[in-house]
UniProtKB/Swiss-Prot annotation:
InterPro entries in the record: Ribosomal_eL44 (IPR000552), Ribosomal_LSU_eL42 (IPR053708), Ribosomal_zn-bd (IPR011332)
Biological classification of the source: Eukaryota, Fungi, Dikarya, Ascomycota, Saccharomycotina
Naturally occurring in which organism (per UniProt): Candida maltosa (Yeast)
Protein's recorded name: Large ribosomal subunit protein eL42Q
Gene name in the database record: RIM-C
Superkingdom: Eukaryota
GO function terms (MF aspect): structural constituent of ribosome
Length: 106
């Protein structure tokens, strides 16, 4: 499990800032797929009517994790940027910090 603080002091390249400022950290989440994207319209048109599945359904999934992407929002000018991290299975935002010599708690 990766523990990431909810705020991060990093460079902001917004017009108002162009310096290091505090950024609010959230995890990126993909939006809902549009029904009106060209590929989706073409696919739906092809699928309609008789004839079953017309395009191959992908089954050979190779990866077990996804890359974590952080969304950073500047607290001064509200400029947003994304920061990809390494792959991990679990992510925790703003969890408690580990301390040396502490017993494990479950």
């Amino acid at each position: 499990m990766v523990n990431i603080p909810k705020t991060r002091n990093t460079y902001c390249k917004g017009k108002g800032c162009r310096k290091h400022t505090i950024h609010k950290v959230t995890q990126y989440k993909s939006g809902r797929a549009s029904l009106f994207a060209q590929g989706k319209r073409r696919y739906d048109r092809k699928q309609s009517g008789y004839g079953g599945q017309t395009k191959q359904v992908f089954h050979k999934k190779a990866k077990t994790t996804k890359k974590i992407v952080l969304k950073l929002e500047c607290t001064v000018c509200k400029t947003k940027k994304q920061l990809p991290l390494k792959r991990c299975k679990h992510i925790e935002l703003g969890g408690e910090k580990k301390q040396k010599g502490q017993a494990l708690q479950f």
